[in-house]
Amino acid sequence: FEIIAFCDLFEGRAQTAKETYGTPDARVYTDYRELLKEDLDVVYVLTPNSTHAEVSIAAMESGKHVMCEKPMAKTYAEAKAMVDVAHRTGKVLNIGYQCRYRADAQYLKQACEDGELGDIYFAKALAVRRRAVPTWGVFLDKDKQGGGPLIDMGTHALDMTLWMMDNYEVESVTGSTFQKLADQTNTGNRWGDWDPAKFTVEDSAFGFIKMKNGATIVLESSWALNMVESEGAQTLLCGTKAGADMKDGLRINRVHYGRQCIEKPDLTTGMPENPDDIEQRIFYHAVADGAELVVKPEQALVVTRVLEAIYESAGTGKTIYFD
């Protein structure tokens, strides 16, 4: 792709992006509606979560394919509208879950598809930080983002886990969210102090997800949590034949000749490709050649619905049951 148009509410930022990434004659806009009048093939939606659906739908309605940053949308209703428009217009809609393209994720996904883990009945999806609250942009603004670490990082962890299990049939969701440290300052945050008055999202969130086949997922996410390690990202899968743990590398637990064995695949051979580059190549071929997407919008829709259910459960104190 050649990037020939940029849009930002602040013209200076759009101009800087043009100078960094654009063609010499790229145009700059402050209103996405004007940009969509251009003869474009693709639009990248990298805006606050509250506008993902609005901009993506307008782009597809005007004949453009869309690459939308995660999370898909702020709400399930918005995400569902995006999928419906993609189906109606026939435009490609890709959601930015680039973690799927990591070497360890690709290896483990193949093992899951080959049945090496058997029936996966328990999983843990972890994306936690002790003190790494993003203090820039609108990350702390619930109206613009829809939430905090759950919708920011937990969305990656949940997407990875559902994809590995190849199970999107959710029965129920129970969740808890906390805002226990948001009113504190001088806490050693990685990116400096935040303004407690502007911290309107949760600082940690947890979910218990039960699938229709009985499988269970535990989801944990945080920006600020008094844990021992500084951060952690983990996908733990437990199956009837084997188990796997993606945390600081990949380990697979198997039984060989009656003995428990831990396998650590060598994923360092050759030059591993950047997951972002793989994502762009797959998106390009989906647009240019009609190739199949790895991240299906229908899958991202389920992720969005589960995240929304965690917030709803946390607010009502009740388990949320899916149809």
Model-derived features: positions:
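Conserved SAM-binding strand-loop segment of SAM-dependent methyltransferases
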Residues: D25-Y32
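Hydrophobic residues in well-ordered beta-strands that form the structural core
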Residues: T30, C68, L93-I95, L219, ...
